[in-house]
C-alpha cells in the first residue's frame, strides 16, 4: 500500500471516529471539535487536498449538526418556521472558511444590467419593468455545493445573486412591479421575539426599498408595506403593486433591497439585494470616465455557510452577523483579469454588519474617489484605503497601468476589526483579510482598446452646506443599547411603533446632532433625505453622560453642552458630499446637515413627500435595524 493511500485511510478513519463519538454523546460534542477541525483541515476540500473532491464532499456531509434528536436526521434542512436556539451543548455543523476554500479560483461575475427607460425617436422615455423575487440555488464557490438563495430577476432563470443592476436615466420615471414568487417559508431561521411581519396565511413577506432614492412615501418600501406571494396577504401600509421612481435626483449610485419588518437581516442575507444607477449623460460624458467593460460594480458581502452549502445564521437574534466567507458579486474570493489601464469600480458594502477597510496590496495602488453613495464629490480625492460601512458605496478609479512591470497580481485586502471599530485586532485564522484578486495583464500585452479615459479635474458642484437654506431645526438623535429590554437598540429610547417625533418640513434643511452612546460605529441612513457629516466632537466625561442619559433620556438635563467639548475630528475628504449613509463613531457627537430637498438643483422635491405612510431613519447594521434601531420620519408641508 502506497504512503498516500495509508495517509488517506488514516484520515478517513479519524473522521469516522470523531463523528461517531460526537453523535453518541451530543452533550459532549464540544470535546471533539478540536479533533474535527484537525481532520477537516487535512481534508480541506481544496483542489490540492489529500483526497478527491467527491470523497471530501461525502465526508463533509457526515459532520454533526444541531445534535438532532432524530437518529435518522443526517442532513441539515433550513427550518420552515422560527425555531428556538439550540440547547446547551449542541453544536452547529462545521462551516466553510478561508481554511477550507481555495481562494481566487472563480472569476468575478459581471452583473447583468437592465435598462430602466426606453428609447423613442432617439429620446429616453418611461417604461415599466416587472422584477420578481425567486427561490433558487447559487454556486458561491467552485468547491461548494449549491446554496439555496432568494434573488431578484426578470425570471427565475435570469435571477442572480446579487440581482440585476437597474440603469435609470435622470428625469425619466421608471415603474416597477415587484412580484413575490417566494415559497411558503423562509430559507433562513428568524427570531419571533423580534417585531416581525408574520402573515396569517403563510408565505415570506417582502417589500422593496430603493436605498438613496428620492420618491413619494408610497413608493419607499415601508416596513409595514410588505406582501406575500401573488399579493395574497399584505401589511398595514401596503397600497399598490407597482412603484414609480421619478429619478429626479442627481446621478449616482443607489441600490435596492428588501425592507420587510423584522426580516431585513435574513432576507438580505438570503440574497435580496442589487444595485441601481441613475445616469445623466450630459453631465457624465464630458467627464470621460472609464466605461463599458471597464466600469464594474463590486458588491461585497460576508456570509457563513455550512459545508452542505446552506447559509448559516443563528436562530436567535444576535447584535451583529459576521460571516467567515467574503463574497464579491456572489463569488467567494473571486479574481478579475484586468488590463493595464484605468477601471471604474463602484464598491458597495452589502454586508449585514461587517465594515471593510480596504487597500490594494497594502497600498500598492491608490483609490481615486470620484463619488460616494448617490453623489459625486466636488473634486476627486486620492486615498490609500477606504473604510466602508454596511450600505455605503464608494465610486473609485484604479489605474492598473501604474503597477511595476513585474507585478501581475494585486489583492484587495480588508483590515477592519469586527465589531467596528473596537473589535479585537487579532488575526482570525478563519478569515485572513483577503477580499479578491486582480490578475493584471503583462506589460507587453496589447490592450483590447486604447485607454482614452481620464480622472476628471473637477467633480459635480452640488449646493454646498452654506448654499442651502439655513437649518430650521436642531435635533438631538441619541443611539442607545440595552436601555430597556436586554438586546434592544433604540433611538432616543423609542421604537418604530412609537409616535413619530421627527417631523421636518419638506424642502427645508435641519441640523442633527447624533450622539452615540454605544461601543459600535453605526451607519445612519435616512430615507428620502441626503445628508453629510460636518464634524465629529468627542464627548468628555462619557460614562457620566451616558449614565445620566440612560436614566433621564434628556440632553439638557444631562448637560450635553458641558460634555460635547472634546477634540473635533474632521470628516474624511472622500466623505465630504451628500450621502445616504453616514458613519456615527462611538463616544462622539456627529453633526449632520440633513437636506429634505434636491441638493443638485437646490430645489424642493417636485412631488408630494408628505403623504402616508411617511419614511423612516435607522442604523444600517441590519441586525440593529431589526431590533429596533429604527424610527419613523414624517415630512410636513
From Swiss-Prot:
<feature type="glycosylation site" description="N-linked (GlcNAc...) asparagine">
    <location>
        <position position="553"/>
    </location>
</feature>
<dbReference type="GO" id="GO:0005789">
    <property type="term" value="C:endoplasmic reticulum membrane"/>
</dbReference>
<dbReference type="InterPro" id="IPR052152">
    <property type="entry name" value="LPR1/LPR2"/>
</dbReference>
<feature type="glycosylation site" description="N-linked (GlcNAc...) asparagine">
    <location>
        <position position="100"/>
    </location>
</feature>
<feature type="glycosylation site" description="N-linked (GlcNAc...) asparagine">
    <location>
        <position position="234"/>
    </location>
</feature>
<feature type="signal peptide">
    <location>
        <begin position="1"/>
        <end position="21"/>
    </location>
</feature>
<feature type="binding site" description="type 1 copper site">
    <location>
        <position position="629"/>
    </location>
    <ligand>
        <name>Cu cation 4</name>
    </ligand>
</feature>
<keyword id="KW-0732">Signal</keyword>
<comment type="function">
    <text>Multicopper oxidase that may play a role in the maintenance of inorganic phosphate homeostasis.</text>
</comment>
<comment type="similarity">
    <text>Belongs to the multicopper oxidase family.</text>
</comment>
<feature type="domain" description="Plastocyanin-like">
    <location>
        <begin position="334"/>
        <end position="406"/>
    </location>
</feature>
<feature type="binding site" description="type 1 copper site">
    <location>
        <position position="624"/>
    </location>
    <ligand>
        <name>Cu cation 4</name>
    </ligand>
</feature>
<feature type="glycosylation site" description="N-linked (GlcNAc...) asparagine">
    <location>
        <position position="357"/>
    </location>
</feature>
<feature type="glycosylation site" description="N-linked (GlcNAc...) asparagine">
    <location>
        <position position="516"/>
    </location>
</feature>
<feature type="binding site" description="type 1 copper site">
    <location>
        <position position="522"/>
    </location>
    <ligand>
        <name>Cu cation 4</name>
    </ligand>
</feature>
<feature type="glycosylation site" description="N-linked (GlcNAc...) asparagine">
    <location>
        <position position="425"/>
    </location>
</feature>
<dbReference type="GO" id="GO:0016491">
    <property type="term" value="F:oxidoreductase activity"/>
</dbReference>
<feature type="glycosylation site" description="N-linked (GlcNAc...) asparagine">
    <location>
        <position position="349"/>
    </location>
</feature>
<dbReference type="InterPro" id="IPR001117">
    <property type="entry name" value="Cu-oxidase_2nd"/>
</dbReference>
<dbReference type="InterPro" id="IPR011706">
    <property type="entry name" value="Cu-oxidase_C"/>
</dbReference>
<dbReference type="InterPro" id="IPR011707">
    <property type="entry name" value="Cu-oxidase-like_N"/>
</dbReference>
<protein>
    <recommendedName>
        <fullName>Multicopper oxidase LPR1 homolog 5</fullName>
        <ecNumber>1.-.-.-</ecNumber>
    </recommendedName>
</protein>
<feature type="binding site" description="type 3 copper site">
    <location>
        <position position="620"/>
    </location>
    <ligand>
        <name>Cu cation 2</name>
    </ligand>
</feature>
<dbReference type="Pfam" id="PF07731">
    <property type="entry name" value="Cu-oxidase_2"/>
</dbReference>
<keyword id="KW-0186">Copper</keyword>
<dbReference type="GO" id="GO:0005507">
    <property type="term" value="F:copper ion binding"/>
</dbReference>
<keyword id="KW-0325">Glycoprotein</keyword>
<dbReference type="Pfam" id="PF07732">
    <property type="entry name" value="Cu-oxidase_3"/>
</dbReference>
<feature type="binding site" description="type 3 copper site">
    <location>
        <position position="257"/>
    </location>
    <ligand>
        <name>Cu cation 2</name>
    </ligand>
</feature>
<feature type="binding site" description="type 2 copper site">
    <location>
        <position position="525"/>
    </location>
    <ligand>
        <name>Cu cation 1</name>
    </ligand>
</feature>
<feature type="binding site" description="type 3 copper site">
    <location>
        <position position="527"/>
    </location>
    <ligand>
        <name>Cu cation 3</name>
    </ligand>
</feature>
<feature type="binding site" description="type 3 copper site">
    <location>
        <position position="211"/>
    </location>
    <ligand>
        <name>Cu cation 2</name>
    </ligand>
</feature>
<dbReference type="InterPro" id="IPR002355">
    <property type="entry name" value="Cu_oxidase_Cu_BS"/>
</dbReference>
<keyword id="KW-0472">Membrane</keyword>
<dbReference type="InterPro" id="IPR008972">
    <property type="entry name" value="Cupredoxin"/>
</dbReference>
<feature type="binding site" description="type 1 copper site">
    <location>
        <position position="619"/>
    </location>
    <ligand>
        <name>Cu cation 4</name>
    </ligand>
</feature>
<feature type="glycosylation site" description="N-linked (GlcNAc...) asparagine">
    <location>
        <position position="482"/>
    </location>
</feature>
<feature type="binding site" description="type 3 copper site">
    <location>
        <position position="259"/>
    </location>
    <ligand>
        <name>Cu cation 3</name>
    </ligand>
</feature>
<dbReference type="GO" id="GO:0016036">
    <property type="term" value="P:cellular response to phosphate starvation"/>
</dbReference>
<feature type="binding site" description="type 2 copper site">
    <location>
        <position position="209"/>
    </location>
    <ligand>
        <name>Cu cation 1</name>
    </ligand>
</feature>
<dbReference type="Pfam" id="PF00394">
    <property type="entry name" value="Cu-oxidase"/>
</dbReference>
<keyword id="KW-0479">Metal-binding</keyword>
Amino acid at each position: 500500500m502506497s504512503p498516500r493511500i495509508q495517509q488517506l485511510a488514516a484520515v478517513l478513519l479519524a473522521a469516522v471516529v470523531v463523528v461517531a463519538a460526537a453523535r453518541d454523546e451530543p452533550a459532549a460534542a464540544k470535546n471533539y471539535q478540536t479533533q474535527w477541525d484537525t481532520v477537516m483541515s487535512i481534508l480541506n476540500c481544496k483542489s490540492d487536498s489529500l483526497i478527491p473532491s467527491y470523497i471530501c464532499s461525502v465526508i463533509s456531509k457526515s459532520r454533526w449538526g444541531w445534535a438532532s434528536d432524530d437518529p435518522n436526521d443526517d442532513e441539515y434542512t433550513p427550518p420552515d418556521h422560527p425555531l428556538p436556539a439550540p440547547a446547551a451543548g449542541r453544536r452547529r455543523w462545521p462551516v466553510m472558511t478561508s481554511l477550507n476554500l481555495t481562494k481566487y479560483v472563480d472569476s468575478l461575475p459581471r452583473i447583468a444590467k437592465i435598462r430602466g427607460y426606453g428609447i423613442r425617436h432617439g429620446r429616453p422615455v418611461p417604461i415599466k419593468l416587472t422584477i420578481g423575487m425567486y427561490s433558487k440555488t447559487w454556486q458561491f464557490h467552485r468547491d461548494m455545493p449549491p446554496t439555496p438563495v432568494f434573488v431578484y430577476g426578470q425570471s427565475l432563470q435570469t435571477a442572480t445573486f446579487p440581482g440585476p443592476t437597474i440603469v435609470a436615466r435622470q428625469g425619466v420615471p421608471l415603474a416597477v412591479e415587484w412580484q413575490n414568487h417566494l415559497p411558503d417559508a423562509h430559507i433562513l431561521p428568524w427570531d419571533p421575539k423580534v417585531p416581525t411581519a408574520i402573515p396569517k396565511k403563510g408565505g415570506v413577506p417582502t417589500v422593496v426599498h430603493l436605498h438613496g432614492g428620492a420618491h413619494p412615501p408610497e413608493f419607499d418600501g415601508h416596513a409595514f408595506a410588505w406582501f406575500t406571494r401573488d399579493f395574497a396577504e399584505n401589511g398595514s401600509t401596503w397600497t399598490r403593486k407597482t412603484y414609480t421612481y421619478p429619478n429626479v435626483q442627481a446621478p449616482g449610485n443607489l441600490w435596492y433591497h428588501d425592507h420587510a419588518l423584522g426580516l431585513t437581516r435574513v432576507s438580505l442575507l438570503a440574497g435580496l439585494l442589487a444595485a441601481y444607477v441613475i445616469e445623466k449623460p450630459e453631465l457624465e460624458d464630458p467627464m470621460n470616465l472609464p466605461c463599458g467593460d471597464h466600469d464594474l460594480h463590486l458588491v461585497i458581502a460576508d456570509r457563513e455557510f455550512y459545508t452542505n452549502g446552506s447559509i448559516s445564521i443563528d436562530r436567535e437574534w444576535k447584535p451583529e452577523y459576521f460571516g467567515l466567507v467574503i463574497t464579491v458579486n456572489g463569488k467567494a474570493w473571486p479574481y478579475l483579469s484586468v488590463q493595464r489601464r484605468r477601471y471604474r469600480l463602484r464598491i458597495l458594502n452589502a454586508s449585514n454588519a461587517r465594515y471593510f477597510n480596504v487597500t490594494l496590496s497594502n497600498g500598492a495602488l491608490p483609490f481615486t474617489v470620484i463619488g460616494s453613495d448617490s453623489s459625486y464629490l466636488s473634486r476627486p480625492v486620492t486615498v490609500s484605503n477606504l473604510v466602508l460601512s454596511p450600505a455605503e458605496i464608494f465610486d473609485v478609479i484604479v489605474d492598473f497601468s501604474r503597477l511595476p512591470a513585474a507585478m501581475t497580481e494585486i489583492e484587495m485586502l480588508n483590515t477592519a476589526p469586527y465589531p467596528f471599530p473596537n473589535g479585537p485586532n487579532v488575526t482570525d485564522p478563519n478569515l485572513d483579510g483577503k477580499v479578491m484578486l486582480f490578475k493584471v495583464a503583462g506589460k507587453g500585452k496589447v490592450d483590447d482598446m486604447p485607454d482614452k479615459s481620464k480622472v476628471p479635474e473637477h467633480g459635480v458642484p452640488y449646493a454646498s452646506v452654506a448654499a442651502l437654506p439655513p437649518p430650521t431645526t436642531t435635533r438631538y438623535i441619541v443611539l442607545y443599547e440595552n436601555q430597556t429590554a436586554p438586546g434592544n437598540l433604540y433611538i432616543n429610547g423609542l421604537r418604530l411603533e412609537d409616535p413619530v417625533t421627527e417631523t421636518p418640513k419638506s424642502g427645508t434643511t435641519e441640523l442633527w446632532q447624533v450622539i452615540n452612546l454605544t461601543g459600535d460605529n453605526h451607519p445612519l441612513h435616512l430615507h428620502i433625505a441626503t445628508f453629510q457629516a460636518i464634524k465629529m466632537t468627542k464627548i468628555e466625561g462619557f460614562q457620566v453622560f451616558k449614565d445620566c442619559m440612560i436614566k433621564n433620556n434628556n440632553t439638557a438635563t444631562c448637560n450635553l453642552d458641558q460634555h460635547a467639548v472634546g477634540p473635533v475630528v474632521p470628516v474624511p475628504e472622500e466623505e465630504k458630499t451628500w450621502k445616504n449613509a453616514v458613519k456615527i463613531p462611538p463616544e462622539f457627537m456627529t453633526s449632520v446637515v440633513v437636506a429634505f430637498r434636491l441638493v443638485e438643483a437646490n430645489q424642493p422635491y417636485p412631488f408630494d413627500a408628505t403623504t402616508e405612510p411617511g419614511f423612516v431613519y435607522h442604523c444600517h447594521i441590519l441586525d440593529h435595524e431589526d431590533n429596533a434601531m429604527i424610527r419613523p420620519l414624517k415630512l410636513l408641508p
